[in-house]
Regions:
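Cytosolic-side membrane-entry/anchor segment at the start of a transmembrane helix
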Residues: 2-39
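Juxtamembrane/disordered regions of integral membrane proteins
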Residues: 11-21, 45, 49, 53, ...
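Juxtamembrane helix-loop-helix connectors linking adjacent transmembrane helices
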Residues: 19-24, 28, 42-112, 126, ...
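Alpha-helical transmembrane segments of multipass membrane proteins
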Residues: 31-36, 67-75, 116, 166, ...
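Transmembrane helix-loop-helix hairpins at the membrane interface
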Residues: 85, 94-206
Length: 206
């Protein structure tokens, strides 16, 4: 899961919206992460591809954090300007983030950020040619992963674009650490911001 910044909307009356519990969300994140890592492992084991390396370089770590903050800022701009995305993001994040406690945001960053980047950038990019076509294909797959329903297509569009940005960063640095760090940063910061806005709005109503 890739969570992009939004402000909670109290007018979420989607007919298909079913509130999830904290346990359900955490289990879903954990199982999804295990599944994606298993797919990556099997692909590397039986496919003729090599994993994009993870190099622990301070410079690349900082690039990843900066990229994650940039994606978060860009997401807030898209949220403000594109009504369809705003409604889609509100639906998606209300379903995923609302049940979580603050400490859970660590898992929100780490589990999707590491497992999704391992597969979509670490394995798919080298497997499909390590070029622009590979970025496009892996980004489309990444976007589809975030499809909760056809009505939420704007969220998928933005996730695809962000996946492309992460893919470019991987090719530019030849280091999987960059998109991993960016993804974890985006998820964690977006989750914290969403929780803060939810708390602020609840206090204003009192």
């Amino acid at each position: 899961m890739s969570s992009f910044i939004s402000v909670p909307d109290s007018n979420l009356n989607e007919p298909e919206f079913t509130p999830l519990t904290r346990t359900q969300v955490l289990i879903a994140m954990g199982l999804t992460a295990v599944f994606l890592m298993l797919v990556s492992k099997l692909w590397l084991q039986f496919g003729s591809t090599l994993l994009l390396p993870v190099q622990w370089l301070t410079q690349d770590l900082l690039i990843g954090v900066g990229l994650g903050l940039g994606v978060t800022l860009a997401s807030s701009g898209v949220y403000a300007l594109w009504g369809a995305y705003r409604r889609s993001a509100d639906y998606y994040l209300e379903m995923v983030l609302k049940p979580l406690a603050l400490p859970d945001l660590i898992w929100l960053g780490l589990l999707p950020g590491l497992s999704e980047e391992l597969l979509f950038r670490g394995v798919m990019l080298p497997a499909f040619g390590y070029d622009a076509t590979a970025i496009l294909f892996s980004s489309l797959c990444f976007g589809v992963l975030h499809l909760s329903s056809l009505r939420q297509w704007p969220y998928v569009v933005w996730a695809t674009i962000v996946g492309g940005v992460f893919g470019v960063s991987a090719l530019a640095t030849h280091n999987l650490l960059v998109p991993m760090t960016a993804h974890v940063t985006t998820n964690f910061v977006s989750g914290c911001f969403w929780k803060w806005e939810e708390y602020r709005k609840s206090t204003l109503k009192e």
